[in-house]
C-alpha cells in the first residue's frame, strides 16, 4: 500500500486522502497542470465555494473553489473517509446536486 501523501478534513466532515503513488499518476498522466498545486487542492477541499454530488454516482462529490482560476477536486466518499479521484481547472461548475455552499 502506498503512503498517504496528504489528508484533509472537508466541511462535510469527510477525511479525504491521496497517496503519493496516485498523486504522481494524477500529475503525470491525468492533469499535469496540477503539478505543484497541492496547497490549492487542500484549500479547495477544506474551504470550497460549493460541493456538488454527482448525478451518476451518489458516492462521488465535486468540490469547487475559485482562486486564480476555478478548481474542481473530485472525491469518492465512503462513510467518513474519501479519496481524490482527480483534480483539474475548469471553466464552469458541472451539473450535480448542490449539497453544500459557503
Identify the residue ranges that each predicted region occupies:
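Ribonuclease/tRNase effector modules and their secretory precursors
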Residues: 1-102
Amino acid at each position: 500500500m502506498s503512503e498517504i501523501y496528504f489528508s484533509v478534513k472537508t466541511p462535510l466532515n469527510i477525511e479525504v486522502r491521496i497517496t503519493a503513488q496516485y498523486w504522481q499518476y494524477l500529475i503525470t498522466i491525468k492533469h499535469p497542470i496540477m503539478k505543484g498545486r497541492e496547497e490549492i487542492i487542500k484549500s479547495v477541499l477544506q474551504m470550497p465555494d460549493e460541493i456538488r454530488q454527482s448525478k451518476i454516482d451518489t458516492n462521488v462529490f465535486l468540490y469547487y473553489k475559485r482562486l486564480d482560476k476555478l478548481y474542481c477536486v473530485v472525491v469518492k466518499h465512503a462513510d467518513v473517509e474519501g479519496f481524490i479521484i482527480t483534480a483539474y481547472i475548469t471553466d464552469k461548475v458541472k451539473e450535480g446536486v448542490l449539497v453544500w455552499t459557503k
